[in-house]
Design a protein with these regions (language model features):
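Nucleotide-activated chemistry modules centered on ATP-dependent adenylation/adenylyltransferase
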Residues: 1-224
Length: 224
């Protein structure tokens, strides 16, 4: 049994990675979430900070919030790993990446700097099969972001099911959304009662820059 910290997005892939680690007898010492200091939302997935805290409480796993403005993202991440190693006795940081080599290299480099292992439970497995494993394991997740150049806004708010995955594939998008076509928020699961996402939501949108390309993402604003 080894203690680990989970680099957590509140989405399906990181949740499945967390689930696999727990099933193997490992102990999650904390959830590590990077937060945009200026917006009080998680980087990349845009989950409000107050909701992240509710997820941590629901999972009964301590939370490590890494506040960064972006230019210090790398150093802050490594610093958080070092602190977790020293204070919590973790052996590794777990990531939900599947096959994006650049992500793996970055994560591995940060873990090497911190003197811990980088663990990728889903690495190079079939994307579509991973989605079905997630669904068949009893987890429930809602689509909270879509890239409009790939998918229509009618997918927003849909619970990810086998039928919805089929619809996603028919748009030409990756079944797992690994290319950024969509992001999810997990609200229920087999090993824990997650926070109910539907308590007071409203639509919102913002324009963000990804790799210097302007994209419009529609999302759910989730509040309590």
């Amino acid at each position: 049994m080894k203690k680990f910290v989970m680099s957590y997005s509140c989405g399906k892939d990181s949740t499945l990675a967390l689930y696999r680690m727990i099933k193997k007898g490992n102990t999650p010492a904390a959830l590590l979430v990077t937060v945009n200091k200026e917006e009080n939302r998680s980087w990349f997935h845009g989950i409000p900070e107050n909701l992240i805290k509710e997820v941590s409480k629901s999972l009964n796993i301590p939370l490590i919030l890494v506040e960064t403005k972006g230019n210090d993202y790398e150093s802050k991440f490594t610093e958080a790993l070092i602190k977790a190693k020293d204070s919590l006795g973790i052996h590794s940081c777990v990531f939900g990446d599947i096959d994006l080599e650049a992500h793996r290299e970055w994560c591995t480099a940060r873990c090497n700097e911190a003197g811990i292992e980088a663990n990728f439970p889903l690495w190079q497995e079939n994307r579509e099969e991973l989605v079905y494993e997630f669904i068949d394991s009893g987890f429930k997740t809602v689509i909270k972001n879509v890239k409009l150049e790939c998918m229509g806004e009618d997918f927003l708010g849909k619970v990810l099911t086998r039928e919805v995955v089929k619809d996603i594939k028919e748009t030409g998008s990756d079944a797992c959304g690994e290319n950024g076509e969509y992001h999810t928020f997990v609200y229920d699961g087999t090993f824990v009662e997650f926070v109910a996402y539907f308590l007071g939501y409203k639509f919102w949108y913002k324009i963000i820059t990804i790799n210097f390309k302007l994209c419009i993402h529609y999302s759910f604003e989730i509040s309590f």
